[in-house]
Amino acid sequence: MKLSIVLSTHAAQFQAVAFKGDFETNVAKIAGYGYEGVELAIRDPKLVNPEELEAVIRQHRLVVPALGTGQAWGEERLSFTNSDPAIRRAAIERIKSHIPLAARFKAVVILGLIRGITPAGQTHEQSMAYLIEALQECSAAAAPYGVRYALEPLNRYETDLIHTVTDGLDLIERVGADNFGLLLDTFHMNIEEPSIEESIRACGSRIFHFHVADSNRWYPGAGHLDFKRILTTLFETGYSGFVSGEFMPKPDADTGARRGIEYLRQF
């Protein structure tokens, strides 16, 4: 099992990121705890120097399995489903701007809250139409570079759009792109799925990336989820990618990262 953990290259408001800020120090810590990968949360690719990122990551013999994009929503409120066409266009262009960096690292680009929330006065159907249109454009732009997008089903308290694997598989069919799949997250699945294991089986080969956090969004092992069953089911689908920790820095980032990997290494 290949394990990674989320690291924001800059300060961020999003709570479920264990490491933020001092990039070089945090990469060294992550490697020291035994992780093989670091999932980079990047609000805007223009804010980072790809050569410097790669140098630090290679120095510590890590890889980058995925790029997170959620801060574009959290910090700037960019989204694919905003009623303002200028904001929708800015969101699409921002996501497309991740393609060169993703190609460089052979990383999946994650689509979380960049999908947005249906605004007042707009129907759910219109939001879905905007979402599908945006995903089709982004997927088409990424395909020539071998870059894949993974949309993350999120719980009902964060968005009204795409909560379950069933929702996600329907969206995949409507988007119609081979390089578009899903990121499954155990925290959200625990809220929305009748059975985490059955949902993983249903998603199968369209699982492009996988996040772990326990039921309380702490590190795996701090809540009540059965990770032995979950991970066994995941690998039975043929999944060979990274399992990436996206959890709150509780009781603190270092303790959570260390305890999380110690727990997951049992399986």
What are these regions (language model features)?
Residues 1-97, 103, 177, 205, ...:
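N-terminal pre-domain/capping segments
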Residues 43, 114, 154, 215, ...:
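Flexible loop residues that form catalytic
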Residues 24-28, 50-54, 95-99, 132-139, ...:
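Generic structural signal for well-ordered alpha-helices
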Residues 30, 38, 57, 91, ...:
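Conserved, mostly hydrophobic/aromatic
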Residues 22, 78-181:
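Active-site acidic/histidine proton-transfer and metal-coordination neighborhood
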Residues 10-20, 79-86, 122, 158-162, ...:
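Gly/Pro-rich active-site loop or hairpin
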Residues 3-7, 38-40, 64-69, 109-111, ...:
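Hydrophobic faces of well-ordered beta-strands that scaffold small-molecule active sites
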